[in-house]
Amino acid sequence: MSGDDLDERIETYYVRVRGVVQGVGFRHATVREAHALKLRGWVANLDDGSVEAMLQGPAPQIDRMLAWLRHGPSTAHVTEVTFEERPTDKRFERFQQH
């Protein structure tokens, strides 16, 4: 068995966060939180002022990240978080900011 053991149930979720989430360090804080939870994927700004992310990892860590995204860093004001599971065979290598 590998030390990585990514064969446990890995889930992938697409997330959209709306509110005051650009220009406040939201993506940087999201990367830090994702690294702390050992999640993989990415986070990016969208032209409409929202932030999108792809989260990949075990369900308990995904749930913790979704809970964190509902408020984000203290500099942000989150008004809405939507998410949906996106089953995929693709495995991200790390979590990064786009």
From Swiss-Prot:
The keyword Ligase does not apply. Belongs to the acylphosphatase family. It catalyses: an acyl phosphate + H2O = a carboxylate + phosphate + H(+). This is Acylphosphatase. GO terms for molecular function: acylphosphatase activity. Residues 12-98 form the Acylphosphatase-like domain. It comes from the Bacteria. SUPFAM superfamilies: Acylphosphatase/BLUF domain-like (SSF54975). The keyword Hydrolase applies.
